[in-house]
Structure formats: C-alpha cells, structure tokens
C-alpha cells in the first residue's frame, strides 16, 4: 500500500499551488488553482465553467493555504 495513484490524490486531497492571502489578521486566503471536473475534497464552494472538461475553481475563503499539490507527490 505504498503507492497512491496520482489521479485520486489530485482530486481528493486538499492542496493548492496558486494561493493568495491578504495581509490582514487573520489572513484571507484564496486558492486560484483550476482543476478539471471537480474541486478538492475540502472545498465548500466549487464553481465550474460549462466546458468539456469542466474547469473548476474553489472560491472558499480560508485563513491558511493548503500544501502545494505538486510537491506532495515527490516528498511524502
């Protein structure tokens, strides 16, 4: 059980490569990643464009950034 498939972890594990935060306290952070067909599992407000495949963005406001999606796969 050491290998986890990339496709399941990409869509389900909350992660973000393009995260922006305000300088307020607490910070207001937004993930600007575009994902195909769905948002990550922790996303409460997911907006998808009506395209094939759908381009989805998570519009949640959090006070932190999720771990980077691409670094996840290499260092575990």
Curated annotation (Swiss-Prot):
<dbReference type="InterPro" id="IPR035995">
    <property type="entry name" value="Bowman-Birk_prot_inh"/>
</dbReference>
<feature type="disulfide bond">
    <location>
        <begin position="43"/>
        <end position="58"/>
    </location>
</feature>
<feature type="site" description="Reactive bond for trypsin">
    <location>
        <begin position="23"/>
        <end position="24"/>
    </location>
</feature>
<dbReference type="GO" id="GO:0005576">
    <property type="term" value="C:extracellular region"/>
</dbReference>
<dbReference type="GO" id="GO:0004867">
    <property type="term" value="F:serine-type endopeptidase inhibitor activity"/>
</dbReference>
<feature type="disulfide bond">
    <location>
        <begin position="15"/>
        <end position="69"/>
    </location>
</feature>
<feature type="disulfide bond">
    <location>
        <begin position="19"/>
        <end position="65"/>
    </location>
</feature>
<keyword id="KW-1015">Disulfide bond</keyword>
<keyword id="KW-0646">Protease inhibitor</keyword>
<protein>
    <recommendedName>
        <fullName>Bowman-Birk type proteinase inhibitor DE-4</fullName>
    </recommendedName>
</protein>
<feature type="site" description="Reactive bond for chymotrypsin">
    <location>
        <begin position="50"/>
        <end position="51"/>
    </location>
</feature>
<dbReference type="Pfam" id="PF00228">
    <property type="entry name" value="Bowman-Birk_leg"/>
</dbReference>
<feature type="disulfide bond">
    <location>
        <begin position="39"/>
        <end position="46"/>
    </location>
</feature>
<feature type="disulfide bond">
    <location>
        <begin position="16"/>
        <end position="31"/>
    </location>
</feature>
<feature type="disulfide bond">
    <location>
        <begin position="48"/>
        <end position="56"/>
    </location>
</feature>
<comment type="similarity">
    <text>Belongs to the Bowman-Birk serine protease inhibitor family.</text>
</comment>
<feature type="disulfide bond">
    <location>
        <begin position="21"/>
        <end position="29"/>
    </location>
</feature>
<keyword id="KW-0722">Serine protease inhibitor</keyword>
<dbReference type="InterPro" id="IPR000877">
    <property type="entry name" value="Prot_inh_BBI"/>
</dbReference>
């Amino acid at each position: 059980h050491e290998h986890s498939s990339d496709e399941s972890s990409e869509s389900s594990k909350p992660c973000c490569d393009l995260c922006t935060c305000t300088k307020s306290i607490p910070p207001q952070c937004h993930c600007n990643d575009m994902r195909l067909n769905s948002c990550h599992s922790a996303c409460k407000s997911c907006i998808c464009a009506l395209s094939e495949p759908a381009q989805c963005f998570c519009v949640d406001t959090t006070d932190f950034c999720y771990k980077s999606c691409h670094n996840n796969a290499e260092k575990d």
